[in-house]
């Protein structure tokens, strides 16, 4: 199945469908932004990022922006659910901008980008966390931006985007490193 984010029902939710576009199933339905989904290596689970406004004021702000085709990407948490949408579990709880989650090929760990350790909220680094939310580990320690991490299928390499070593302001480059456990 293919997993994706859509506004087809009025909110940014996660759906799955067969590769031919048939049998579309809505997997999330809480108010807020659910996006960036990826299947686990065995296809049994999905990792994604979500912003779930909780106060009346936050919901009104989110809804007004969404009506204009916008979102305010501020607080995003990482969630895991079963591939049928059941068992939705928040695995980060830090109020930061956590995004770009991707499964380690073992299927038990997730790598993602976050600004959780920068008081200004501007610097993003890569972090690894166990599927159950334990074992948080910081992977990169760089001023600036590290994001969009992806493992090679065999887990030997990590690829990510970064503005480290930028030749010009705002330049982002692709980096690859051997992954050593």
Model regions and ranges:
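Sequence signature of WD/YWTD-type beta-propeller architectures
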Residues: 1-181
């Amino acid at each position: 199945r293919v997993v994706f984010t859509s506004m087809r029902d009025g909110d940014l939710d996660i759906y799955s469908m067969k590769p031919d576009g048939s049998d579309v199933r809505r997997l999330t339905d809480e108010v807020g932004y659910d996006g960036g989904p990826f299947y686990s290596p065995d296809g049994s689970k999905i990792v994604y990022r979500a912003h779930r406004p909780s106060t009346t004021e936050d919901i009104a702000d989110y809804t007004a922006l969404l009506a204009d085709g916008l979102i305010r990407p501020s607080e995003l948490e990482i969630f895991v659910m079963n591939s049928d949408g059941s068992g939705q579990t928040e695995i980060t709880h830090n109020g930061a901008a956590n995004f770009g989650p991707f499964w380690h090929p073992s299927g038990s760990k997730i790598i993602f980008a976050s600004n959780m350790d920068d008081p200004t909220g501007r610097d993003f680094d890569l972090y690894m966390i166990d599927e159950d939310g334990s074992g948080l580990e910081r992977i990169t320690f760089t001023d600036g931006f590290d994001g969009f991490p992806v493992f090679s299928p065999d887990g030997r390499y990590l690829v990510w985007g970064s503005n480290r070593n930028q030749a010009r302001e705002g330049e982002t480059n692709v980096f690859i490193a051997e992954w050593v456990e």
